[in-house]
Amino acid sequence: MIVEYPIDSIAVRQWSSRSTNGGSTGVAVAGVYLFEGETYRGYIYFYPDGTELRPPAINLAQGQIQLHFNLSQYNSTLDLLHNEGVVALYYTSSTDAGLKTGKDPFATPTQDAV
């Protein structure tokens, strides 16, 4: 089963009172909520590095996917979501789910860059 949703907007949440020092509390310290238009498609929760992450999950009835990443992936994930033209949230199995991009051509050098 392959489920894929195009993502065109996000909302971010960061908690001020949660420790980012590690440990296995299982409590997320940041979250990114993913949308296709006005439809909520799921979230990515970020946990302190070293936390044992839960596997991804899917709720087919609601059309939502839940992902769990290490906090060290937070900046690159936000960068990908803000800067890639085409981003999709996908779920294939409990061991294969995440974000992916579409084809993005390399920039053509301008005369100034030569």
Regions found by a protein language model. Give the residues of each.
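Short linear motifs at secondary-structure transitions and domain/linker junctions
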Residues: 1-9, 19-22, 62-66, 73-76, ...
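OB-fold ssDNA-binding interfaces and closely related basic DNA-contact patches used
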Residues: 1-45
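Generic low-complexity segments that are intrinsically disordered, proline-rich and/or Lys/Arg-biased
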Residues: 7, 49, 56-57, 106, ...
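A structural detector for beta-sheet-dominated domains
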Residues: 13-15, 33-35, 45-47, 70, ...
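Generic "edge-of-domain/loop-turn" microfeature
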Residues: 17, 39, 51, 96, ...
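Short, well-ordered strand-loop elements centered on a beta-strand within folded domains, enriched
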Residues: 25-31, 53-57, 96-104
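Acidic, aromatic-enriched beta-alpha/helix-loop junctions
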Residues: 39-78
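Short, compact, well-ordered microdomains
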Residues: 66-114
